Amino acid sequence: MAEENPGALAANVPYLGVDELGASVIVEPGLEGSNAGGRTLPAAAIKFADLTESGSESGDNEAEEPVSAGPDNANAIGEPGTSASAAEENGTVERNSPPPNCAICLSRCRRKCFTDSCMHQFCFKCLCEWSKIKPECPLCKQPFRTIIHNVRTLDDYDRYPVQTTSPVPTENPSLRYHIVRRPRYTPLVQNQAVIVNDIEAAIAAGAAGEDVLSAAEVAAGRRSYSRFEPYRSELMNYYQHDQDASTSGSLSQLWRRYVYDRKLYALPVSDSVTGHFREWSARFYRNNPAQIHRLMPWIHRDIMCLLRNAAHSVNTVMTLMSDLLPMTSLLGPTFRRRLSPYLGERTSHFIHELFNFARSPYDINGYDHVVQYSARVAEEVEVDLLDMVETQSSNGDDLNLEVGDSDADAINAGFSPDWSPPRVRPSTSVIVTNPGATHSFSVTMASDGSELPGISIRRTTNVGSQTVAINLSMRRPAAVASEEPEVIEIDDGDAAANAEVAAINDGSNTSRRHAGATLPVTAHIELESSSSSGDEDECVFVLELKPPHMRTPEQVSLDSNSDSDVVFVNEQHEAAPDAIAENRSTQSPLDLASRDQGLFMGPSTSGAAANRGKNWKLVMAQTRRLDQLRTLRSIRSKKSRRSSMPARSDSGSSPSSCSSSSFHFSSSSDEDSSDSSTTNSEPPKKKSRKRVANNKRSKKESIGKRTSRKRKAKDQNMEMLEQQQISQKKPQRQPESSSDSPSSSDDESGGDSSESSGQPNTNNNKSSSDSDDDSAVNMQLSALRATLKAEATLEDRKPVKLELQLPDDDQAGPLHSRMTPSPREDNEPGCSAPKRRRSCSHSNQSSQSASLASSSTATSSSAPLSSFAWGAAGFSGDPLMRGHPAMEEHDIANSLIELSTLTQPVNIGLFNEHYNSAENSMGMLSNTLCDSPQTLAADDANLENYFDTDADPEASRERDAYSLEAAIDVVGESELQIAEDTATATEEQDEEDEEDEDQEEDDQEEEKAAEEEEEEEEDDDDSDNHDENDENQGLLPY
């Protein structure tokens, strides 16, 4: 179908050069079969006229086609719209290269044709089939609607419309929008994208008698129709009657005028690689003055466009800009207020354009290549949120929104009559602009002329959401209020673009537009409308923010232990540490010990009380800490006593010792005693180092060794006594007295000791003349033992603690054994039974030791027993005193002498041959026992040695036979307690030493300790050790 084009849109375009006009042809479809008023093709299209004159489709005459090679080669590689060289007047030009082939079939073009959007040539048949699939140029990808073929002259050609299958929308040419992209070769603006409203163009074309495009053609390809040509024609027609346009200096300034006049808003331009924006703050410009020089050319170009007819000087505004940029933020109210006197209503638009250029990574030329614009409608109600952002940042409680009505007369002041917009518009446009915001929102508004529900704006930021209530009151004229409801939706079409939103409605249809707009807070806008008439729409925004304590908390914690639903966690945690600190400072150790009883109580009804029950771990740790402190205090006190006792014993004058105790058997010679004391003084140092090495071993191994050693000590104890007595050439102990006097208790103990050792009881004492006195003393001691035992059993009292402390000048005798600390009392039942069994197993040995001590004392004393005659009247009220006072005095004295010997083995010098030592000890006893019972109780509290309350079977037999009880097993109990004290103090002291010593020394000591332990085990077998740590106690060599 052949059609003729009557349009001539480019006929009245001013001359801009052959290259520009040759590519600016827009071929519009004309009426069918009409040649009147047809549009003239550009001069470059004359080549197609010469080529297709014959109308042949065979392509035989292609060799004679006068085609210029330059444009064809350029078109073959896809360069759109390059102009061809002008044909000569005779129309014959020789070509230097063959014509290009068809890009579709790759062969010679048959019946050449081209599209209405570009001048690329193809086969007519190939391009028709290609358009059925996709109406785009195969080379430059520009969409087209018609195919131009069979060109005879510039005004005589055929057109083939492209077929389309898209649905036909409702015809509304006054509301059409299309996207226009400008080609790269254009010197005006390169690769700029705009959204143009062609309402005015369509009306102007209809008024001029031109045909309006059908809706089907718009749907087919009008939305992207001709990247540059429709816009360029519109631009030239827009300023064709403007005298300033010809003297504007450059097309760039003309374009900037068009941007401001047509309300085109630039979209943000970021770095294509990183997506970041350039810094644009006032501080940045103060620190980098060179960045201001980058902005000045762009500012100067726009200021000249805006102030071309104004009385203000461009230099004045440029000076003001250089002062404001380093001092004031671009989006601040101060910057806007200083520019308003010069730029007037276009101040906000200028700030928007300057802001986008300032944060773009390009200079002025690069920015013009890549920037894209978004259009606004001419008549609109503009809600500018720029001030709201600044005010919100400075004052969080006040939100100010500037609302202004754009004046249609001012907008259309520079319009030519051909491009004048319609005078009456049934729709209302709402534009929300906020280029500095970063979050989106949506608005939905409906109005029917009465009370309206309002506009809802909701926005949620990445940090958190905030609710703002804004009341919007709008008064409209009655004519506007009578229209149908309209819906305006402001959505986040492109949040990063800071795009504006436009919603345009006609009287019958409702439409929605989407773009990027943002709010710094979540807002709720209520719209109130009244029918009162007015010249302008008035919008009043009122902000209402709830105080912080009335807002919904971001985090709510629920506690199951509390009766209330909401628990304020912060208040709880602040109160709990104060309560704990107060309890620690006010409670005594007894209160802390009794505090464990209420640790595991049920959940409380209050949150604070429920949290206190969780402090039981702290209470337990506090209790353990107090126990450790008490243990350390007791150990230190015992260490101080032990350190003072050797000092006192060194001042003694007796060089020899002939007595024997349950701990050691020493020889009677002075040399043996001095050697034993010397060797006894060395092992403690060696043993302390050995103990540190042994602590590295596991406890299981040490416990097993202790058990085996205890058993060996029990089994071989009696055998060692017998072997030692036989093997020794010299007597190791003094025999007991065998006098005929009634000393039944002492004879019985002597008999027991002889039976246990397997030897007959013989007397080798040289002082046999004093045996009678010795027997009397022994009888008194036995009576005292029986009395004490009976009293402890009847009254069920705690064992009495006894310890004798002699004056420094009265103590004598060398140190024969290593001192051991006294342990804490062990109240566990499992531990008391074995101790008592050991005490009973060695009762014979204790009796023998007591007999030896008594006989030694009787032998060494040359004075009568009247030296014990200290005042007994002071003890008449004592419950332990029984029988005749005189005999009880002697019994108590002798018994305490024996007890002091057994509990303090270092003071063995009390029972030697020297008479002076015995007399001094008697004097000390008289001074000690003359005190009141309260003094004795106080001494018992400080000393920690107790009698054994278990009944002695041998003592019960003696009590039946002689009415006097045998000796109380004080020796075994004291040994056990001393051993326990030794174990406890040694372990705790070793733990402290272990932390101080280095790891390398411990490894070396382990190897040495292994060898020393083997030697020590042999020595331990010869010793009489009844303690759990008996392997650590020094032994005397035999």
UniProtKB/Swiss-Prot annotation:
GO terms for biological process: centrosome separation; chromatin organization; male meiosis chromosome segregation; meiotic chromosome condensation; nuclear membrane organization; nucleus organization; protein monoubiquitination; protein polyubiquitination. The modification Phosphothreonine is found at T820. Residues 495-682 are annotated as: Interaction with hairy/hry. SMART domains: RING (SM00184). GO terms for cellular component: nuclear lamina; nucleus; polytene chromosome. Pfam families: zf-C3HC4. Residues 792-801 have a biased composition (Basic and acidic residues). InterPro entries: Znf_C3HC4_RING-type, Znf_RING, Znf_RING/FYVE/PHD, Znf_RING_CS. SUPFAM superfamilies: RING/U-box. Residues 53-96, 627-858, 972-1038 are annotated as: Disordered. It is found in: Nucleus; Chromosome. Keywords: Chromatin regulator, Chromosome, Metal-binding, Nucleus, Phosphoprotein, Transcription, Transcription regulation, Transferase, Ubl conjugation pathway, Zinc, Zinc-finger. The modification Phosphoserine is found at S822. It catalyses: S-ubiquitinyl-[E2 ubiquitin-conjugating enzyme]-L-cysteine + [acceptor protein]-L-lysine = [E2 ubiquitin-conjugating enzyme]-L-cysteine + N(6)-ubiquitinyl-[acceptor protein]-L-lysine. Residues 643-668, 723-744, 841-858 have a biased composition (Low complexity). Changing C118S: Abrogates enhancement of gypsy chromatin insulator activity. Its EC number is 2.3.2.27. One of its GO terms (molecular function) is lamin binding. Residues 987-1031 have a biased composition (Acidic residues). Residues 633-642, 686-699 have a biased composition (Basic residues). A zinc finger (RING-type) spans 102-141. Functions as a ubiquitin-protein E3 ligase. Negatively regulates the transcriptional repressor hairy/hry by promoting its ubiquitination and subsequent degradation. Also directs the nuclear organization of the gypsy chromatin insulator. Chromatin insulators are regulatory elements which establish independent domains of transcriptional activity within eukaryotic genomes. Insulators have two defining properties; they can block the communication between an enhancer and a promoter when placed between them, and can also buffer transgenes from position effect variegation (PEV). Interacts with hairy/hry, p53 and Top1. Interacts with the gypsy chromatin insulator complex, composed of Cp190, mod(mdg4) and su(Hw); interacts directly with mod(mdg4) and su(Hw). Interacts with Lam/lamin. This is E3 ubiquitin-protein ligase Topors. It comes from Drosophila melanogaster (Fruit fly). The lineage of its organism: Eukaryota, Metazoa, Ecdysozoa, Arthropoda, Hexapoda. The gene is Topors.
